Amino acid sequence: MLLIPAIDLKDGQCVRLKQGDMDQATIFSEDPAAMARKWVDLGARRLHLVDLNGAFAGKPKNLEAIEAILGEVGDEIPVQLGGGIRSLETIEKYLDAGLSYVIIGTAAVKDPGFLRDACSAFAGNIIVGLDAKDGKVATDGWSKLTGHEVIDLAQKFEDYGVESIVYTDIGRDGMLQGINIEATVKLAQAVGIPVIASGGLSNIVDIEKLCEVEDEGIEGVICGRAIYSGDLDFAAAQKRADELNGELDDA
């Protein structure tokens, strides 16, 4: 089970939002590259970046910070990024800069042909981000709820060739209420590609619960507010996940 620290970028700073609200941003660092270094030194094996300004603008907006992070840790671990990815040119630019994966969210829902083209042009590098509330997919920085069922879209996008799915329960994100394990497992069981859980991770108990269902196809979990607020000790949590993984493998 991969524990993947999130670095959310707003105006070049590392922040956390409450339920995707740009007006409710807490700044945790003015040096995102130093934050990336911290998580890698604590044992992170992948990083999750979000260009928050980009998500709302529809184009890259935190390039300098992203390049600084890649310069710091990009040679050591895979880095994935979402937010504002709406063109093949943007994907190519990001992959050339050293990103391992790009996450397509809103654009995948609104323009499935773009996602299909991206999977074809950059096979193995495309992750789809599905943000849902009560099983329905949301777009545009969570501001619009669609009528699409998350499982229907996930299966369609799997057919296109996406590498994995980041599934966020937006009712819980940034609220420290616990991961929606049931919904995440349901999605993972419905597809044959890995699912990365996101939204609401609050403590070590969530990690233990996720490890129990890892074999359903849950590859990892994105760690946001809990590791910044101190509710979750990242290094201890990754160690615990590895221990549980070993125990389950031995069973």
Swiss-Prot record:
Domain of life: Bacteria
EC number: 5.3.1.16
GO molecular function: 1-(5-phosphoribosyl)-5-[(5-phosphoribosylamino)methylideneamino]imidazole-4-carboxamide isomerase activity
Catalytic center residues: D8, D131
GO process terms (BP): L-histidine biosynthetic process; L-tryptophan biosynthetic process
GO CC, alphabetical: cytoplasm
Coiled coil: none
Keyword Isomerase: yes
Pfam families: His_biosynth (PF00977)
Protein family according to the UniProt entry: Belongs to the HisA/HisF family.
Protein name as it appears in the record: 1-(5-phosphoribosyl)-5-[(5-phosphoribosylamino)methylideneamino] imidazole-4-carboxamide isomerase
Lineage of the species this protein comes from: Bacteria, Pseudomonadati, Pseudomonadota, Betaproteobacteria, Burkholderiales
